[in-house]
Amino acid sequence: MNAYGAKGQHGLPVRPGMTVPLPGPLHSHKDKLSELADMGYTDIWSAEADGADAFTPLALAAAWEPRLRLGTAIVPAYTRSPALFAQSVASMADAAPGRFAIGVGSSSNVIVERWNGIPFEEPYKKVRDVVRFLNDALGGEKVTKEYDTFKVDGFRLGIKPEVKPQILVAALREGMLRLAAREADGTIINWLSPEDVTRVAEVVHGAANGTPKEIVARIFVCPSTNT
């Protein structure tokens, strides 16, 4: 994965990253993470589907390898309650101050509805509401608010991270890309060609009104003895 955040396109640096967890048991990854940092990787990004959850590999990495920035790419907006979502994000941000970014997205009908039994409805609104709630909760305020897709009554985080984590939105279509630019710190993209990434950057930076936004792009590589 690459994160474009003040010397690549649009003045943002390129940060090479790797998807985690790597093969093998989680408890065996300490040396592998250090090797990634030694090789020049700056970020690691977790996912959440049918294997490890998104937070546990990053919590281990936070303790094992302080050189790496940590991010989720992504946590589904549907599969945690609002309060639990905020608690998980705040805990990771507290474990790795200034090194954690939370990526949130709609995920898919298979993961949300078929595997978790949650209706996969109004994905744009759901992601938007989770982003807005996280911004409210991570700011330390007591949240009593009715969002379009859920409501929260009197929740205040009992843990306030030293550094508020960046919030990134997984997006492919223009509506979600503009949401990421307007209400989050950037976007996470997947399954796109280099030419598509250029077009995505134009949409995101155009909607950001001059505010720098990070673009995290997942790149699939198939290494072999011939490459």
Label each PLM-derived region with a short phrase.
Residues 1-227:
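Active-site-adjacent structural elements that line small-molecule/cofactor binding pockets in enzymes
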